[in-house]
């Protein structure tokens, strides 16, 4: 009726905030987000396959947008930006044994597969052979593992975020949960993500759409006028 189709996707859950060490907590969280990215890409491939076989859901494969809230926001941003091995093996994503000095990636692609859900001894590939490209992502209260993941030429993105969120940081810093303490360090929230995406020119295409003068954007910008910082494309929502 409204001209678009919405799919509410499910993905694998499971991370352990009560793990014995910070490294294990961080690894658990990273693996959970990584698996969710794989599952979401599998879902996009499923819909593209269905499109070629009758299009049961009536989708337009030229206009696929991924949106998520909280953990789903992390998935959306990771979906758009993680596309090479070097990005998931940055020094902060490595576990160094205190006794032997052995270095182990927190994400072992030989075990759980790559970011598209291919390969891996313990991974089952779903709907191979179809594209899992999307055309835009929206994060609500999410974040990104490292700002270096963002590169010129990647898809547009927007974000909604509470500047004073006590768990999901708005700028760049640590992730901590009241019941578990520090989980991982130096991640970036919506403000810094959108600032870099805009600087790279990835969102330039959005300015041709109502040129930022639609009533929703104007209302969000007005509401954000007294917030802690503001970057085009990130809309600050109050917390209450």
Features from the language model and the residues they span:
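Cap/lid segment of the alpha/beta-hydrolase catalytic domain
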Residues: 1, 5-34, 217-220
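Hydrolases whose catalytic domains are alpha/beta-hydrolase-1, hotdog thioesterase
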Residues: 71, 75-79, 148
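Structural recognition of the beta-strand scaffold that forms the well-ordered cores
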Residues: 5-10, 63-67, 75-77, 135-140, ...
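C-terminal catalytic histidine-bearing segment of alpha/beta-hydrolase fold enzymes
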Residues: 198-240
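Surface-exposed patches in mature extracellular/periplasmic domains of secreted proteins
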Residues: 53-64, 149, 204-213
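The feature captures the conserved acid-bearing segment of alpha/beta-hydrolase catalytic domains
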Residues: 98-205
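Gly/Ser-rich "nucleophile elbow"/oxyanion-hole loop immediately N-terminal to the catalytic nucleophile
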Residues: 23-38, 42-70, 85-91, 103-109
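Sec-exported extracytoplasmic/periplasmic mature domains
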Residues: 45-53, 80-85, 142, 198-202
């Amino acid at each position: 009726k409204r001209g678009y189709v919405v799919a509410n996707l499910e993905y694998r859950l499971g991370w352990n905030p009560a793990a014995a060490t910070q490294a294990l907590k961080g690894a658990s969280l990273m693996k959970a987000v990584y698996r969710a990215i794989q599952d979401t890409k599998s879902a996009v491939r499923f819909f593209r396959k269905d499109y070629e076989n009758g299009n049961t859901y009536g989708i337009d494969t030229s206009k696929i947008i991924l949106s998520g809230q909280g953990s789903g926001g992390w998935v959306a941003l990771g979906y758009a930006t993680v596309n090479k091995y070097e990005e998931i093996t940055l020094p902060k994503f490595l576990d160094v044994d205190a006794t032997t000095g052995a270095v182990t990636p927190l994400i072992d692609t030989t075990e759980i597969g790559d970011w598209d859900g291919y390969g891996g001894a313990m991974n089952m590939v779903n709907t191979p052979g179809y594209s899992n490209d999307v055309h835009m992502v929206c994060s609500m209260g999410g974040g990104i593992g490292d700002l270096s993941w963002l590169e010129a030429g990647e898809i547009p993105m927007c974000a909604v975020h509470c500047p004073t969120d006590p768990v999901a940081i708005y700028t760049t810093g640590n992730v901590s949960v009241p019941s578990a303490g520090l989980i991982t360090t130096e991640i970036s929230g919506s403000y810094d993500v959108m600032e870099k995406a805009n600087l790279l020119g990835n969102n330039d295409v959005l300015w041709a759409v109502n040129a930022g003068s639609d009533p929703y954007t104007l209302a969000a910008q007005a509401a954000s006028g007294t917030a802690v910082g503001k970057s085009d494309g990130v809309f600050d929502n109050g917390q209450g």
